[in-house]
């Protein structure tokens, strides 16, 4: 169960990383075409790197290089970056290997193809010449794997853990995208566009709002939209549902602290009064939600909740030092 949770979570993390890097790279090209000089490039990458949680000295070193490819290489391939795309795919693949009997041959095949794509791209100049094409391939493979998870394995307890990992990661990343939106400046059309595209929300947002690009509307949609698959509210409701599917507890009750905390988050999101909220109030809402999700993530595999068997060794970036195989 632990391995399935992290398998799904790492795939979701890679897709979100690729989308954020892709939209930021496109924005940097647009800025450089209109404003000559390196400062334009620095100004757009620094809040992104901060948002991704990299150490300040690493960020300073990357910005000082004044080279977008150095930043992208760090995000994509660096062995010093535990959350690089390459490391996340290696960890997803290793988690899949440990539960090989619980996933389909199609999932295993595409994970191997993904792993080989990343390995071959590491030393290939093509990705530097066309990062957009590289990120499109990464995003497409993540979406393919998500589809295979939904359509090629039993929808049993293991699948519920896969969905749990996906939705907790997705909710967290949407919150971080909104935090980045606040840091980058909400009133610039470029910032609004990249925020929606980073969350795969551009088309859905236009359909729901008929083209209103007010900052508070962006916050409200990505936080509270009840039927958009990447809104925080939707993800938390799904998280709550799948946790209850695992425990067998009725959805209107709870059997452990994880379900209690998840239910509380859902209640906050369901009953938040969006009509009387300005963007300042909505921004202040982000950090407490991130803290709540972090608490839930840490609680899921506590021994009194959904504990994994003691003999099962998880593979994730927070585990004790492990030798990464299949590099």
Where are these regions (language model features)?
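Alpha-helical transmembrane segments and their helix-helix packing motifs
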Residues: 1-327
């Amino acid at each position: 169960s632990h391995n399935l949770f992290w398998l799904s979570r790492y795939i979701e993390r890679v897709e979100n990383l690729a989308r954020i890097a892709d939209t930021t790279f496109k924005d940097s090209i647009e800025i450089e075409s209109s404003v000559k000089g390196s400062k334009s490039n620095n100004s757009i990458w620094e809040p992104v790197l901060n948002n991704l949680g990299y150490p300040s000295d690493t960020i300073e070193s990357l910005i000082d290089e004044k080279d977008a490819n150095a930043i992208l290489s760090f995000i994509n391939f660096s062995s010093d970056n535990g959350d690089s795309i390459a490391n996340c795919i290696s960890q997803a693949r290793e988690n899949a290997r440990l539960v090989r009997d619980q996933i389909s041959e199609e999932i295993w095949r595409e994970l191997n193809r993904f792993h080989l794509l990343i390995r071959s791209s590491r030393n290939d100049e093509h990705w530097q010449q066309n990062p957009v094409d590289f990120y499109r391939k990464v995003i497409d493979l993540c979406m393919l794997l998500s589809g295979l998870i939904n359509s090629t394995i039993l929808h049993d307890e293991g699948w519920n853990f896969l969905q749990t990992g996906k939705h907790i990661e997705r909710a967290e990343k949407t919150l971080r995208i909104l935090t980045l939106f606040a840091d980058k400046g909400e009133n610039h059309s470029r910032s609004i566009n990249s925020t929606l595209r980073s969350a795969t929300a551009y088309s859905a947002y236009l359909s729901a709002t008929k083209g209103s690009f007010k900052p508070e509307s962006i916050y409200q949609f990505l936080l509270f939209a009840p039927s958009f698959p990447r809104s925080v509210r939707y993800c938390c409701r799904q998280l709550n549902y799948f946790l209850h599917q695992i425990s067998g507890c009725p959805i209107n009750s709870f059997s452990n602290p994880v379900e209690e905390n998840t239910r509380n988050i859902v209640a906050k999101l369901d009953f938040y009064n969006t009509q009387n909220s300005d963007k300042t109030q909505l921004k202040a809402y982000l950090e407490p939600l991130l803290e709540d999700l972090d608490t839930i993530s840490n609680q899921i595999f506590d021994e009194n909740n959904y504990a994994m068997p003691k003999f099962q060794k998880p593979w994730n970036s927070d585990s004790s030092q492990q030798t990464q195989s299949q590099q």
